[in-house]
Amino acid sequence: MRNKNFLIIVIGQIISLFGNAIQRFSMSLYLLEFTGSTAVFSQILAISTIPYIIFAPISGKLSDSVNRKKIMVYLDFFCAALIGIYAFILLRGNDSALIVGTVMFILSICYTLYGPAVTSSIPQIVDEENLTSANGIINQVGSIVNVVGPILAGILYGLLGIKVIVIINAVSFLLSAIMEMFLDIPDVAKNDESTEKLVSMDFIKKSFGDMKDSFVYLKKEKKVVLAIIASYAFCNIFLVPILSIVAPYFINVLLELPSEIYGIVEGVCVLGMILGGFWISIKPKMFSMKKVHYTYYPMIAGVTLMSILGFIKINNYAMATIFAFGGLLIMLSLSLSNVLTLTFIQKQVPSNMLGRVSAFSVAVATISVAPGQLLYGQVIDMGIPLGIILIVTVIFNIGLVVFIKKRVSDTVVESEEKAA
């Protein structure tokens, strides 16, 4: 795909995602070691989602009002400076729980503002016929980075600790910002309301009003899109915590394996995203929204495989291998379904609404992260066997597949039949 702007976004995403993957992995281990409790660990992660909830409405309005290149560049420079300052604090040995929490809180704000700008810019720089492949490529290259990141982070964390990882992340944000300065993204079409001051109470009030308007719009005009967004929330409650809460507990605490092994396990899990992104990029016509529920079948198989580990006793490394393969199947499902549904949303929602709808989607998905993390953290701390937890997870996710089939796949089929 010969497209300068798309190439820059892809390279910029590789660089910044590389830093993010390393930081996410290392901070998970850092917090788990620091707190010593799965419940407290999950609570801290849940609190870090609060900025997403608060700033998601503003991010959509911002993305539909300001040039999306400027949003990406300014935020990456800011993150580079913030993490650079945090690296300086770490090197001086002045770190504390308050500082860690503050840095995570501010970074969460930046991620919230950044996401809709990237998502909304893709349809501006890529032709509609190449949109599915473009989203697949972005998903794929990001996934490759996410495979290498945890493995390298596990080695760095085990050998050198958190300090080196934070420095690497600061550099990655700086390089990403420099790359994005060469983007050429046109301004979005503006109405009279978009000329108001961005930093004002009116802007903030209208941003939250836009969130409500997005919901009303989707409920009336795009019910399938609303159902897709609801499925994202369901995944974040009953699926994602397996990788964010259960995985570090199972590998590092229950099996007592080193951080390097956890890095490899997470890398194998993310390999599923590479396979999914590669598959849908080269064979986009194999997948359609009429059968989107099929993409969730590997996820059911993966969680079922993981649940077996709660009832067998074999070599710890063999158990970690089985867990990793189950995670690979989960990520394969998420990769295929996310690219397919994201492309569908981009085609269905008008450009002047896309940023706000993307922000609404992020808000709903993010609000659902905290309950999932808290739920899994608490049930693990209560001493409920991991096998039982995962069997219940399988049941809930079978319900998700049924929901997707009835509310998304069948609805798309009915709409196409009416249009024919």
Give the residues covered by each predicted segment.
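Helix-loop junctions on the cytosolic side of multi-pass membrane transporters
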Residues: 120, 124, 166-199, 405-417
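Structural signal for membrane-spanning alpha-helices in multi-pass inner-membrane proteins
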Residues: 28, 83-90, 157-158, 176, ...
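Juxtamembrane intracellular "pre-TM" segments in multi-pass secondary transporters
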Residues: 1-6, 186-229
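A single, central transmembrane helix in multi-pass transporters
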Residues: 162-167, 206, 210-275
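C-terminal transmembrane bundle of multi-pass solute transporters/carriers
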Residues: 54, 71, 80, 85, ...
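Substrate-agnostic recognition of the 12-TM MFS/MFS-like secondary transporter fold
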Residues: 7-24, 45-61, 67-82, 99-158, ...
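Transmembrane alpha-helix termini and helix-breaking/packing motifs in multi-pass membrane transporters
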Residues: 28-35, 87-92, 148-168, 253-254, ...
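Helix-loop interface residues and adjacent transmembrane-helix termini in multi-pass membrane transporters
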Residues: 3, 34-35, 65, 94, ...
